[in-house]
């Protein structure tokens, strides 16, 4: 082999060696870069997972209020309740809307609902009464069959007697002595209203009716006198307002007359006082004048 061929083969080997080294370095750099990229992606994934977890925890901790609560608060602010129609037992009341009424109205009635007061309604009056019978009514609202009714005959110092009648209206025949009844209104076996009645005898009822006309006559007389006095005072005030100048002049003249009289009396008093204070004549001067005359 010639020296020239040997030099060419050596140069070729060196070139191939450098190419192999360059390939190994490039491959190693690619692996390192991939590893770094994979590590970065892993860290990014972990960061995203942590961010998502933190966001979920924040969302759980700071959850917005439920729409039902908000709607309920809005309803409370926009709705008012009217007065109950009764002071005891069962009645109705109006539900009034204060915002969002049709036609731009400030208030409008949305519905009518049931309302309840204290159960004890005391002593009531019958719906009708005659000399033979009387009709009593329990506390109720429409419809009548919604509630249950329990009538009792009250006895002094004894247990009450529960009657068979379970309707809202009870008709009682008058007897020789007064009677007392009680009606309990029940809703789902719960007493919601109680009222009592006194059933008088026919003679007591006649006496009560005979005493009423005298009371009514006295009341009418008092009311009539009161109305007449009020009308007279009103007309008097109107007359004074219309003729205020004449009234003022009249009262001015009335007021000036006592002043003139008081001034005259004071002048008279001063005159009488001055006359009383004049000096009397001296007795010596009278004697001198008499001697001179002689």
From Swiss-Prot:
<dbReference type="GO" id="GO:0001675">
    <property type="term" value="P:acrosome assembly"/>
</dbReference>
<dbReference type="GO" id="GO:0002080">
    <property type="term" value="C:acrosomal membrane"/>
</dbReference>
<keyword id="KW-0325">Glycoprotein</keyword>
<feature type="modified residue" description="Phosphotyrosine">
    <location>
        <position position="269"/>
    </location>
</feature>
<comment type="function">
    <text>Plays a role in acrosome formation and establishment of normal sperm morphology during spermatogenesis. Important for male fertility.</text>
</comment>
<feature type="signal peptide">
    <location>
        <begin position="1"/>
        <end position="29"/>
    </location>
</feature>
<feature type="compositionally biased region" description="Acidic residues">
    <location>
        <begin position="46"/>
        <end position="58"/>
    </location>
</feature>
<feature type="region of interest" description="Disordered">
    <location>
        <begin position="258"/>
        <end position="294"/>
    </location>
</feature>
<keyword id="KW-0597">Phosphoprotein</keyword>
<feature type="glycosylation site" description="N-linked (GlcNAc...) asparagine">
    <location>
        <position position="31"/>
    </location>
</feature>
<feature type="modified residue" description="Phosphoserine">
    <location>
        <position position="256"/>
    </location>
</feature>
<feature type="transmembrane region" description="Helical">
    <location>
        <begin position="222"/>
        <end position="242"/>
    </location>
</feature>
<feature type="compositionally biased region" description="Acidic residues">
    <location>
        <begin position="283"/>
        <end position="294"/>
    </location>
</feature>
<feature type="topological domain" description="Extracellular">
    <location>
        <begin position="30"/>
        <end position="221"/>
    </location>
</feature>
<keyword id="KW-0732">Signal</keyword>
<dbReference type="InterPro" id="IPR037878">
    <property type="entry name" value="SPACA1"/>
</dbReference>
<feature type="compositionally biased region" description="Polar residues">
    <location>
        <begin position="258"/>
        <end position="267"/>
    </location>
</feature>
<feature type="topological domain" description="Cytoplasmic">
    <location>
        <begin position="243"/>
        <end position="294"/>
    </location>
</feature>
<keyword id="KW-0472">Membrane</keyword>
<feature type="region of interest" description="Disordered">
    <location>
        <begin position="42"/>
        <end position="70"/>
    </location>
</feature>
<protein>
    <recommendedName>
        <fullName>Sperm acrosome membrane-associated protein 1</fullName>
    </recommendedName>
</protein>
<keyword id="KW-0968">Cytoplasmic vesicle</keyword>
<keyword id="KW-0812">Transmembrane</keyword>
<feature type="modified residue" description="Phosphoserine">
    <location>
        <position position="290"/>
    </location>
</feature>
<keyword id="KW-0225">Disease variant</keyword>
<keyword id="KW-1133">Transmembrane helix</keyword>
<dbReference type="GO" id="GO:0002079">
    <property type="term" value="C:inner acrosomal membrane"/>
</dbReference>
<comment type="subunit">
    <text>Interacts with CYLC1; the interaction may be relevant for proper acrosome attachment to the nuclear envelope.</text>
</comment>
């Amino acid at each position: 082999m010639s020296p020239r061929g040997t030099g060419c083969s050596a140069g070729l080997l060196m070139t191939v060696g450098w190419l192999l080294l360059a390939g190994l370095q490039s491959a190693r750099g690619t692996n390192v870069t991939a590893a770094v990229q994979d590590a970065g992606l892993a860290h990014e994934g972990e960061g995203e997972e942590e961010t998502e977890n933190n966001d979920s925890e924040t969302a759980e901790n700071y959850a917005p209020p439920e729409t039902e609560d908000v709607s309920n608060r809005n309803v409370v602010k926009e709705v008012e309740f009217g007065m109950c129609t009764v002071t005891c037992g069962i009645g109705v009341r109006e539900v009034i809307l204060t915002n969002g009424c049709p036609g731009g109205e400030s208030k409008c009635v949305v519905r009518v609902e049931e309302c309840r007061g204290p159960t004890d309604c005391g002593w009531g009056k019958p719906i009708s009464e005659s000399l033979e019978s009387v009709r009593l009514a329990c506390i109720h609202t429409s419809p009548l069959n919604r509630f249950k009714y329990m009538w009792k005959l009250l006895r002094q110092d004894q247990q009450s007697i529960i009657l068979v009648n379970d309707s809202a209206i009870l008709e009682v025949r008058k007897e020789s002595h007064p009677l007392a009844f009680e009606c309990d209104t029940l809703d789902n076996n719960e007493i919601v209203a109680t009222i009592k009645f006194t059933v008088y005898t026919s003679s007591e009822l006649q006496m009560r009716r005979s005493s009423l006309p005298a009371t009514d006559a006295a009341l009418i007389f008092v009311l009539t006198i009161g109305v007449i006095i009020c009308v007279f005072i009103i007309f008097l005030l109107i007359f004074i307002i219309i003729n205020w100048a004449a009234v003022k002049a009249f009262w001015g003249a009335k007021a000036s007359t006592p002043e003139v009289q008081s001034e005259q009396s004071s002048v008279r008093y001063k005159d009488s006082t001055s006359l009383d204070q004049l000096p009397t004549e001296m007795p010596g001067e009278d004697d001198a004048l008499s001697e001179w005359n002689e």
